Amino acid sequence: MLIAWPDRVHCCEIMLQEGARVVDAVEMAALNGIEQAVGYAVFGVLVTSDHVLNEGDRVELLRPLLIDPKEARRRRAVSA
């Protein structure tokens, strides 16, 4: 289970029963900041909360974007 913020990353390993879903992993992990998640991914691929996990899957909690990526690039280009 992985959740990242601009200034830190939290990663934890949890053991689940065979056939466990993403929502089961999220509930078991009980990470701080989990309520900010707007979606889930497994190894960078978007999945639903009902996605069945396989052994070794890395579940990522996705946060909302703070700024549009195109706008961020424009701002960096102007300040460079």
Curated annotation (Swiss-Prot):
InterPro entries (UniProt xref): Mopterin_synth/thiamin_S_b (IPR016155), RnfH (IPR005346), RnfH_sf (IPR037021)
Entries under Gene3D superfamilies matching the protein: RnfH-like
Classification via Pfam families: Ub-RnfH
Family according to the record: Belongs to the UPF0125 (RnfH) family.
HAMAP family: UPF0125_RnfH
Protein name: UPF0125 protein XF_2346
Organism of derivation: Xylella fastidiosa (strain 9a5c)
Lineage: Bacteria, Pseudomonadati, Pseudomonadota, Gammaproteobacteria, Lysobacterales
